[in-house]
């Protein structure tokens, strides 16, 4: 499979994995042929890289948790030591016009996901005094936020659920406020307000501004697997790329451009489905059965999205 060859070459020559405490993490891999290989452990990033080059998986994940025995298959015997606090924002879960029914990665949908990520970071920093350790473009439609500080490592599922509720504004009731907002008055919240006064006041006018659409299961699961930063997303062929805060101040086209792994060469691609639109900056107009020569990164993306097949 040509796509697998491209993946192997990337991992052998270009990949830079961004993960700490490798020896305490469980790793999991989804091969190109399907299935899932779990409970793998490695003593170093170099050992991890050698395994990845040899096996060339389609997807690569690591545990948010740290374990005494990460390679143990019995979860009760792994020896849980703590877990990062991780947030996942996915365009698929956003109820915006740009994100509804998009067959391919849409820059407009990704822009919406980026704005949701900025909103999340603002709440984490200003209201919870939690600073992201790592911000990662998922390589598809969203972003992952990792917090690895000591204060979050021992949080259990219940405490993480409370963080989720806070961020999603669960239980917020505008009728419990009484503040003068223009010509209207509402009741003042008599208990501890949800978040900052600014966020609460905005939410009185529009409750949707209070909520951040995170995947709550990801955040509260202390054994969760998350995509390895620096690896390739097997749905797109784009790099799950670590970012800096300043990257979120720019247009998402800059992020996507930097995440393109396969920049050289063209490939023949036979469409099995019709497609009209823009794919990774390339305008496409094709009917089922059409054979086109496309940039390698576009052809690989389309094959992974099951729009057709790459031909020698």
Swiss-Prot record:
Cofactor annotation: Mg(2+); Mn(2+)
**From which domain of life does this come?**
Archaea
Q: Name one GO biological process term.
A: DNA replication, synthesis of primer
- A Pfam family: DNA_primase_S
InterPro entries for the chain: DNA_primase_S, DNA_primase_ssu_euk/arc, DNA_primase_ssu_PriS
EC number(s): the record gives 2.7.7.-
Which SUPFAM superfamilies does the entry mention? Prim-pol domain (SSF56747)
Q: Which organism is it from?
A: Pyrobaculum arsenaticum (strain DSM 13514 / JCM 11321 / PZ6)
What UniProt keywords apply to this chain's record, in alphabetical order? DNA replication, DNA-directed RNA polymerase, Magnesium, Manganese, Metal-binding, Nucleotidyltransferase, Primosome, Transcription, Transferase
Q: Which GO terms describe its molecular function?
A: DNA-directed RNA polymerase activity; metal ion binding
One GO cellular component term of this record is: DNA-directed RNA polymerase complex
Its taxonomic path starts at: Archaea, Thermoproteota, Thermoprotei, Thermoproteales, Thermoproteaceae
Query: How is the quaternary structure described?
Result: Heterodimer of a small subunit (PriS) and a large subunit (PriL).
Q: What is this protein called?
A: DNA primase small subunit PriS
Q: What class of enzyme is it?
A: transferase
State the PANTHER family in the record: DNA PRIMASE SMALL SUBUNIT (PTHR10536)
Query: Catalytic site residues?
Result: 88, 90, 215
The record's comment on protein family reads:
Belongs to the eukaryotic-type primase small subunit family.
């Amino acid at each position: 499979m040509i796509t697998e060859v491209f993946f192997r070459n990337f991992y052998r020559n270009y990949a830079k994995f961004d993960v700490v405490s490798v020896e305490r993490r469980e790793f999991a891999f989804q091969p190109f042929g399907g299935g899932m290989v779990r409970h793998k452990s490695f003593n170093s990033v170099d050992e991890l890289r050698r395994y990845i080059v040899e096996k060339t998986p389609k997807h690569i994940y690591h545990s948010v948790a740290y374990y005494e025995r990460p390679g143990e298959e019995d979860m009760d015997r792994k020896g849980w030591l703590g877990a990062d606090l991780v947030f996942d924002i996915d365009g698929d879960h956003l109820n915006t016009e740009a994100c509804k029914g998009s067959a391919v990665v849409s820059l407009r949908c990704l822009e919406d996901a980026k704005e949701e990520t900025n909103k999340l970071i603002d709440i984490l920093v200003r209201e919870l005094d939690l600073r992201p350790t790592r911000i990662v473009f998922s390589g598809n439609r969203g972003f992952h936020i990792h917090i690895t500080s000591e204060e979050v490592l021992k949080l259990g599922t219940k405490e993480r659920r409370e963080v989720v509720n806070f961020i999603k504004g669960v239980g917020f009731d505008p009728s419990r406020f009484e503040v003068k907002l223009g010509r209207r008055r509402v009741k003042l919240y008599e208990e501890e307000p949800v978040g900052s006064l600014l966020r609460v006041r905005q939410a009185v006018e529009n409750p949707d501004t209070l909520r951040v659409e995170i995947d709550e299961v990801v955040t509260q699961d202390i054994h969760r697997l998350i995509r390895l930063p620096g690896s390739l997303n097997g749905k797109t062929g784009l790099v799950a790329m670590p970012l800096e805060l300043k990257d979120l101040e720019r247009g998402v086209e800059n992020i996507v451009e930097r995440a393109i792994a396969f920049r050289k060469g063209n490939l023949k691609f036979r469409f099995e489905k019709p497609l009209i639109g823009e794919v990774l900056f390339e305008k496409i107009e094709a009917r089922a059965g059409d054979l086109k020569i496309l940039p390698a990164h576009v052809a690989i993306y389309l094959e992974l999205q099951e729009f057709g097949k790459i031909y020698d």
